[in-house]
């Protein structure tokens, strides 16, 4: 009897050892697996012609889903008490074979698939990802358990997203052009309606409100040739076309990132495939994580922080754009100086002040500098697939500064919108970094 009991106990111990060994020996995912989800999201955004503010919203909630999985596994700080109105997510009973890395990636896929209009494409990308997971050794039992938990977390994050007020925007009245001399007007060649005029009503993630960092007022509109505004007008007119150096043209085109760009083809307008400025900076984040050999958890964290910064930066920026409703250089120059003038870049379909590239690029640079330092050298080849040659940078700040001034050379922004946009970007970026660093969440 005693020998039988010893035999049974030995068998149980052996089984436990084997199961623990299986759990320890599970394959490991890397920063590239996280970055691939973001890259596939960007592909779908290009397909859907997703506007820049909305793209930032998709990135933020998708990254949050992956982040929440890792936070509940105690590998990252909880966002409860840090993000505005972030819910307490009740515990879920997950199978002991659940893998947090695998579940985090699948939570991102699940969330993106539900958020994006062509989300079914994300489902196909997820299938390919799971095939690769089986190849490296994940069992179907581990995959099924991890996917179940991923769906649980994704559902909670989607509920949080649903409550941010974006869905109410479709019920708001159609935006009406003011038709005053200095106000924004539709621009050629497509004369598109204004993009997301009510995005400032969306709940912010970290900052207190859309109006927390209101910039200085833009230089007042005036047709007086001695006025500050007219001097801005002349400056934009004089720094265009043949007066731009080839390097200035290269920089402007490198940072164009205009999903709405079209080209004339006879009587038709053909859409050009371009990513949003936020997608570009998420691509830079992937480069930084890969080059620094960041671990899986850190990669999830950095992507989430950059995405949070992008969304809050766009909310701030859009508050200023539609509050000031300022005329674009293209409209003003054609109206008051040269009716045949064209900027190097196509003018995006929303008001001029404040410069979105300046705000969101600086915000992203501040956050990335927090994680990787202020002398991080890298080659930006994010848009090489679209025929844009790579550029080398010595820091994220250098890249953000270049992105900002590119809008002046492109002929779509006045200088005060750029300078004040940079300042606003610093404020948002520092707020995100400081709020998360001193947040109440526990690791």
Residue ranges and their predicted role:
Residues 1-28:
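Bacterial Sec-dependent N-terminal signal peptides
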Residues 21-443:
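Acidic/polar surface patches and capping/hinge elements
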């Amino acid at each position: 009897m005693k020998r039988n009991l010893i035999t049974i106990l030995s068998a149980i111990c052996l089984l436990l050892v084997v199961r623990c060994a299986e759990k320890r020996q599970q394959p490991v995912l890397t920063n590239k697996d996280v970055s691939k989800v973001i890259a596939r999201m960007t592909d779908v955004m290009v397909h859907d012609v997703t506007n820049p503010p909305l793209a930032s919203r998709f990135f933020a909630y998708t990254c949050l889903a992956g982040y929440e999985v890792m936070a509940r596994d105690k590998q990252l700080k909880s966002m409860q008490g840090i993000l505005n109105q972030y819910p307490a997510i009740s515990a879920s009973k997950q199978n002991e074979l659940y893998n947090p890395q695998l579940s985090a990636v699948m939570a991102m896929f699940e969330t993106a698939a539900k958020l994006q209009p062509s989300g079914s494409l994300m489902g196909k990308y997820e299938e390919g990802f799971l095939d690769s997971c089986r190849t490296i050794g994940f069992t179907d039992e581990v995959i099924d358990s991890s996917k179940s938990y991923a769906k649980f977390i994704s559902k909670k994050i989607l509920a949080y997203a649903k409550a941010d007020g974006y869905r109410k925007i479709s019920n708001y009245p159609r935006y009406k052009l003011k038709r005053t001399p200095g106000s924004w007007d539709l621009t050629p060649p497509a004369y598109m309606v204004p993009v997301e005029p009510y995005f400032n009503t969306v709940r912010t993630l970290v900052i207190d409100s859309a109006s927390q960092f209101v910039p200085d007022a833009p230089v007042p509109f005036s047709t007086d040739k001695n006025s500050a505004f007219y001097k801005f007008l002349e400056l934009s007119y004089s720094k265009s076309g043949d007066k731009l150096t080839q390097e200035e043209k290269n920089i402007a085109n490198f940072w164009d990132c205009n999903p709405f760009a079209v080209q004339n083809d006879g009587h038709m307008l053909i859409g050009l495939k371009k990513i949003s400025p936020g997608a570009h900076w998420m691509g830079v984040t992937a480069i930084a994580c890969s080059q620094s050999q960041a671990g899986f958890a850190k990669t999830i964290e950095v992507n989430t922080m950059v995405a949070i910064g992008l969304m809050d930066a766009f909310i701030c920026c859009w508050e200023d754009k539609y509050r000031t409703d300022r005329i674009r250089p293209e409209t003003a120059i054609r109206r008051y100086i040269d009716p045949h003038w064209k900027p190097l870049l196509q003018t995006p379909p929303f008001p001029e002040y404040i410069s979105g590239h300046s705000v969101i690029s600086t915000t992203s640079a501040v956050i990335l500098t927090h994680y990787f330092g202020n002398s991080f050298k890298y080659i930006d080849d994010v848009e090489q697939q679209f025929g844009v040659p790579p550029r080398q940078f010595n820091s994220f700040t250098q890249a953000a500064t270049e992105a900002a001034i590119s809008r002046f050379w492109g002929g779509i922004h006045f200088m005060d919108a750029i300078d004040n946009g940079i300042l606003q970007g610093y404020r948002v970026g520092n707020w995100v970094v400081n709020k998360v660093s001193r947040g109440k969440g526990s690791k």
